Swiss-Prot record:
PANTHER family: GLYCINE--TRNA LIGASE, CHLOROPLASTIC_MITOCHONDRIAL 2, GLYCYL-TRNA SYNTHETASE. Keywords: Aminoacyl-tRNA synthetase, ATP-binding, Cytoplasm, Ligase, Nucleotide-binding, Protein biosynthesis. One of its GO terms (biological process) is glycyl-tRNA aminoacylation. GO terms for cellular component: cytosol. Tetramer of two alpha and two beta subunits. This is Glycine--tRNA ligase beta subunit. Signal peptide: none annotated. The keyword Aminoacyl-tRNA synthetase applies. Its EC number is 6.1.1.14. Belongs to the class-II aminoacyl-tRNA synthetase family.
Length: 689
């Protein structure tokens, strides 16, 4: 069977840059599924994406489905015919479904009986006939949150569509996709190359688009070119470009023919905190800031034009003129804000609502101030500095700079606090209170900052859960999952002596009578333990290891982490599987017994050598391991407990637990309970698979 290259290109108006990659990757994934479901043999499915097009190129696509033999078994002969030999309704219905009469059916005979059988040779459908529906289905499944409709038609898509190119080899596949008749026409760059041209063969793509249309259709190629050219441009001016992945992706999605240029701004603007300047350059203008080797911001920026100009200086000057007023605004706001102390913004917090049932930002500030001080006392941080940081934590939200450049919240608080002469750890805490903002983000760097960051997040968790607005499904408007994971990361990675139980109780207490959920403390703790599950799964821990630790519901995050590492190490020991099975057996035995057990094993009642040996080792280990448990040395404890494998195996091989002698039975059950309690001091290893 011959093979050909297939090309589909959807030509549109400018697509949303932040969604471009996800759109085309979904398109490729959907279409690959369609090909596989149809049984069409194919090679690589390559995707292309540019601001005004989504395209797929499939190598070595079979021209038709393979022929196939089908068999459909019908009713058993006993049910297929009545006593007079006439076909039953079941047989006739089955035959109709197969497109035959009962008389045309074959018979299938096995040692289990005889059935009606339909056999047929089905010729594979041509790829040309299948492709239009496959393309349409793949496009219909794209993750588009908001569809557009254009013109008088009822067609909906992410942006208006102008061209649809469907080529199988050199042949146009006739179809109407998204209201457009397929053709071999492709549109080039708006201002360079040929605005419109025809493509003779799918194999010519994307080279023909580059040569005639001046469009680099390969997304990764554009991105790599921007990165390399920007690095070289920065090197020429003695700096390093800030090429964050997210901005690189966005810029690559905005241009069809990237041309990297370097511009500058007035050095006087460097007196403004770099974060505000960078926010303007990256967030508003999509420019790449440039830093000197010492990490200081240079008065330059790199940007990407979408055209090759005979006079690039004109483009550079235009971009410099655009950014100058924004930088001047930042300078004005910075100077204006510093005319009063940060603390002077406190009264204005009373005018901003945090949440309707939970009060204003000033109310939240008071709670954070108290909670940060309480946390500082628990972890040995400076209580006065922590309460001071709590008091000032939201003041920068009322400044001109943060109002205009919202992403500078926190960092501007730090700069204004430094200007006011606040303690260094207080100022740093104002900046770091929102950390970690995302997975892998840095944690607060000092104890005061840790106290403030935890207080801010716990106040939100307690409040929102306290009014019954916890996350549901994918909806998490208050980012509670991120807040919970942030608290856990800070406590675990900084090894802080905090208990979720008392921490949550204190956060709830500070709300007074505002909360309506009587189970708020348990709900918050359960939610946070659930985030532990997700975190450790991402870290590569097995589900049963996590469940074994969660079964003990440890509420000290650092303690939880120590248990996780201990159980994970325990699983590598030779004795692990046998002891996990033994614990499961002990758990089942104890669960089936409703008898009241003694507080201790009666040594005089022990009879068999195996139970005497096991009982003695349990007593010895109980005393030996007590300091291990007190110090959180769970890994060492489980290594010691692994020595019980031999006496436990011997006990179950030689000793019957559920004997008729009640005194003997209860004594053996008590011993097993004491054995299990030792393991439960760490985790429920009976849950290990």
């Amino acid at each position: 069977m011959s093979e050909k290259t297939f090309l589909v290109e959807i030509g549109t108006e400018e697509l949303p840059p932040k969604a471009l990659r996800s759109l085309v990757e979904s398109f490729a994934a959907n279409f690959t599924v369609e090909l596989d479901n149809a049984g069409l043999a194919h090679g690589t499915v390559q995707w292309f994406a540019a601001p005004r097009r989504l395209a797929l190129k499939v190598a070595n696509l079979a021209e038709a489905q393979p022929d196939r033999e089908i068999e459909k078994r019908g009713p058993a002969i006993a049910q297929a015919f009545d006593a007079e030999g006439k076909p039953s309704k079941a047989a006739e219905g089955w035959a109709r479904g197969c497109g035959i009469t009962v008389d045309q059916a074959e018979r299938l005979t096995t040692d289990k009986g005889e059935w009606l059988l339909y056999r047929a040779h089905v010729k594979g459908e041509s790829t040309e006939a299948l492709l239009p529906n496959m393309v349409a289905t793949s496009l219909a499944k794209l993750p588009i949150p908001k569809l557009m409709r254009w013109g008088a038609s009822d067609v909906h898509f992410v942006r208006p569509v102008h061209t649809v190119t469907l080529l199988l080899g050199d042949k146009v596949i006739p179809a109407t996709i998204l209201g457009i008749q397929s053709d071999r026409v492709i549109r080039g760059h708006r201002f360079m190359g040929e605005p419109e041209f025809t493509i003779d063969n799918a194999d010519q793509y994307p080279e023909i688009l580059r040569e005639r249309g001046k469009v680099i259709a390969d997304y990764e190629e554009r991105k790599a070119k921007i990165k390399a050219d920007a690095e070289e441009a920065a090197r020429k001016i003695g700096g390093n470009a800030d090429l964050s992945e997210s901005l690189l992706e966005e810029v690559a999605s905005l241009v069809e023919w990237p041309v990297v240029l370097t511009a500058k701004f007035e050095e006087k603007f460097l007196a403004v905190p770099a974060e505000a300047l960078v926010y303007t350059m990256k967030g508003d203008q999509k420019y790449f800031p440039v830093y000197a080797n010492d990490g200081k911001l240079l008065p330059n920026f790199i940007f990407v034009a979408n055209i090759e100009s005979k006079d690039p200086q004109q483009i550079i000057s235009g971009n410099e003129k655009v950014v100058r007023p924004r930088l001047a605004d930042a300078e004005f706001f910075f100077n204006t804000d510093r005319k009063k102390r940060l603390e002077d913004n406190l009264p204005r917090l009373q005018t901003v609502l945090f949440q309707q049932q939970l009060g204003t930002l000033r109310d939240k500030t008071d709670r954070i101030q108290a909670l940060a001080g309480w946390i500082a006392e628990q972890i040995g941080a400076d209580v006065n500095h922590a309460t001071r940081a709590g008091l000032l934590s939201k003041c920068d939200l009322m400044t001109n700079m943060v109002f205009e450049f919202t992403d500078t919240q926190g960092v501007m608080g730090m700069h204004y606090a430094c200007h006011d002469g606040e303690a260094e750890d207080v100022a740093v805490a104002l900046n770091e209170q929102y950390q970690p903002r995302f997975a892998g983000d840095d944690l607060p760097s000092n104890p005061v900052a840790c106290a403030l960051a935890i207080a801010d997040k716990m106040d939100t968790l307690a409040g929102i859960f306290g009014i019954g607005q916890h996350p549901k499904g994918d909806k998490d408007p208050f980012a509670l999952r991120r807040a919970a994971l942030g608290v856990l990361r800070i406590i675990v990675e900084k090894n802080l002596n905090l208990d979720l139980q008392t921490l949550t109780e204190e956060a709830v207490r500070l709300y007074g009578d505002k909360l309506t959920n009587a189970n708020v403390v348990d709900d918050v703790i359960d939610f946070m333990l659930g985030r532990f599950r997700a975190w450790y799964q991402d870290e590569g821990y097995t589900v049963d290891t996590i469940q074994a630790v969660l079964a003990r519901r440890p509420t000290r995050p650092a303690d939880f982490d120590a248990r996780m590492k201990a159980v994970s190490h325990f699983r590598t020991l030779d004795a692990a599987a046998a002891l996990a099975a033994a614990n499961k057996r002990v758990s089942n035995i104890l669960a089936k017994s409703d008898e009241v057990l003694s507080d201790r094993v009666n040594a005089s009642t022990l009879k068999e050598p195996e139970e005497i040996k096991l009982a003695m080792q349990v007593v010895v280990l109980r005393d030996k391991l007590e300091p291990y448990f007190a110090e959180g040395r769970y890994q060492d404890a489980l290594v010691e407990l692994a020595e019980l494998r031999e006496p436990v195996d011997a006990f179950f091989d030689k000793v019957m637990v559920m004997v008729d002698d009640k005194e003997l039975r209860l004594n053996r059950l008590t011993m097993l309970e004491k054995l299990r309690e030792l393991f439960l001091r760490v985790a429920d290893i009976s849950l290990l698979q």
